[in-house]
Amino acid sequence: MAAGETQLYAKVSNKLKSRSSPSLLEPLLAMGFPVHTALKALAATGRKTAEEALAWLHDHCNDPSLDDPIPQEYALFLCPTGPLLEKLQEFWRESKRQCAKNRAHEVFPHVTLCDFFTCEDQKVECLYEALKRAGDRLLGSFPTAVPLALHSSISYLGFFVSGSPADVIREFAMTFATEASLLAGTSVSRFWIFSQVPGHGPNLRLSNLTRASFVSHYILQKYCSVKPCTKQLHLTLAHKFYPHHQRTLEQLARAIPLGHSCQWTAALYSRDMRFVHYQTLRALFQYKPQNVDELTLSPGDYIFVDPTQQDEASEGWVIGISQRTGCRGFLPENYTDRASESDTWVKHRMYTFSLATDLNSRKDGEASSRCSGEFLPQTARSLSSLQALQATVARKSVLVVRHGERVDQIFGKAWLQQCSTPDGKYYRPDLNFPCSLPRRSRGIKDFENDPPLSSCGIFQSRIAGDALLDSGIRISSVFASPALRCVQTAKLILEELKLEKKIKIRVEPGIFEWTKWEAGKTTPTLMSLEELKEANFNIDTDYRPAFPLSALMPAESYQEYMDRCTASMVQIVNTCPQDTGVILIVSHGSTLDSCTRPLLGLPPRECGDFAQLVRKIPSLGMCFCEENKEEGKWELVNPPVKTLTHGANAAFNWRNWISGN
């Protein structure tokens, strides 16, 4: 082929040639797993590797539905990639930020080719072959450019695909549906339909749940019922939004440059058919069950919640089913956030239509690999363990930590009256009061709204610092709220890390508590940098904060608080551009949300939800964010240390134990 000549070629991520079903199934059978269970695990993980299926089986060892033949649902979508996808994702973010979430945000940008249908686990590879056959058949006529025309109504905004390109795409969908029906064949399938058993309710959550909550039906399938889309082909931008947002959404949509090059990919996805009408939650924090009927949570876990079955859940709790384990139980709602519907879908295979220019100029090996159906997403895993470790270590990270226990948390707002003499001197009325207080220029009264750590709070902070030392984490810089309890916590953590002399604490008023929650009509009087240095805190006096202390306004609005935290996080991250270690931020419980969401590219949550979430954050609660340079975003990951859990210790009066009383 002459240099510069353009040829249409296809790339299909098909495992039939290089990795047949037996090669994936045999290792699982050799370990003693039943055939139907192994096939279920392979289908649930997209039939990628036996290792992933094995991990799924281990996670689901206590899943009450593990042995039930519940098939996955599958759908075929035409998805944009490249520059056009980036612009569409930008629209997704901006429309959500400016106009709130709507139904379109539940799924990634796509054109539906075939609605969801079921397929038996042992016949999933038939769908892969159907996708390949349909793609190969329409390869020569597939449009090199798909024209998109903007359409808007009072509740819908999207791009329509029409004309001859739409006809070819419909033919592709019809061919896939026909091939899938032929290859899947005829079978008798046993389906399990979810139904509530009268008189039992959610009490069945941990005792043979599936047998109690699912009713089996036998259905004769003459073919795999795949229905190609017969409606106007469309790529939805917004759906079921508020009418007053229509104009803003249209302006954002018109800003999408449709001239960008795009590779269109036909992607086959699956989902769990039982949870189609459930809400999907994503765990933000780790949670260790306190009772047998509670779920274990790890950050990133997805939980399916049926809003109609929450009668027995206490306020602040929900009943859900973990996608990772299949187990059902209670979980604290404020440990989670709403996730998108498609976050739990599994991508199986894709057929990509691309324009390749000057293929002859490529190396032979490169060209052949792109045309031979290699599963390209797996190439990212080909790094050696050493390279992968180096890549992980090199990532910039932010660890946000709430301060330790405050004195006023235990002894109430009148704590200062309990530990001060009439002439203003401090004494220790209880062992949980600190041994001493630092000197303040205006005397002890300024501690009332800027309380110190309790003795237990000091102990908590040291435990956390010691655990961070054991984890091997490398702290490169430390930022703290100007509240005394936060600066104390930062100092104690650094002492346990043996870094108190090497790293100075940068005091950042921009991450101080939401001032609306502070007592009084003025902001509390906080210790100056000079007072902190006199009290033996290693303070960086050269640091110029994003928000000076004098700029803190009393009773600020929720939006003002969020804007303040966002601006502070921008400066904090940019202040350490060369550091690849961990940025430690010691602040208040509220900042675990207000300082991480800007990094994650998430808008502020509703004010009421924010207050509910913050109320449950314990002392030394942590959120850990890592920068993913490959994808150009930050991610919430497991904190480097475990949580600190302990119970209350009530006051004791020995006089109550005098004999006879």
From Swiss-Prot:
One Pfam family here: SH3_9
UniProt record, GO biological process: negative regulation of T cell receptor signaling pathway; regulation of cytokine production
A GO cellular component entry from the record: cytosol
CDD domains recorded: HP_PGM_like, SH3_UBASH3A, UBA_UBS3A_like
Keyword Transferase recorded: no
Superkingdom per UniProt: Eukaryota
Alphabetized PROSITE patterns for the sequence: SH3 (PS50002), UBA (PS50030)
Keywords: Cytoplasm, Nucleus, SH3 domain
Subcellular location: Cytoplasm; Nucleus
Chain intervals for the UniProt region annotation (Phosphatase-like): 395-661
Effect of substituting W317A: Loss of interaction with CBL
Gene3D superfamilies: DNA helicase RuvA subunit, C-terminal domain (1.10.8.10), Phosphoglycerate mutase-like (3.40.50.1240), SH3 Domains (2.30.30.40)
Tissue expression summary: Highest expression of UBASH3A in tissues belonging to the immune system, including spleen, peripheral blood leukocytes, thymus and bone marrow.
Domain UBA: from-to ranges: 15-60
SH3 domain residues: 276-341
Keyword Nucleus: yes
Predominant location category: cytoplasm
Function: Interferes with CBL-mediated down-regulation and degradation of receptor-type tyrosine kinases. Promotes accumulation of activated target receptors, such as T-cell receptors, EGFR and PDGFRB, on the cell surface. Exhibits negligible protein tyrosine phosphatase activity at neutral pH. May act as a dominant-negative regulator of UBASH3B-dependent dephosphorylation. May inhibit dynamin-dependent endocytic pathways by functionally sequestering dynamin via its SH3 domain.
Assembly information from the UniProt record: Homodimer or homooligomer. Interacts with CBL. Part of a complex containing CBL and activated EGFR. Interacts with ubiquitin and with mono-ubiquitinated proteins. Interacts with dynamin.
Name under which the protein is recorded: Ubiquitin-associated and SH3 domain-containing protein A
Organism of derivation: Homo sapiens (Human)
High-level lineage: Eukaryota, Metazoa, Chordata, Craniata, Vertebrata
Designated gene of the protein: UBASH3A
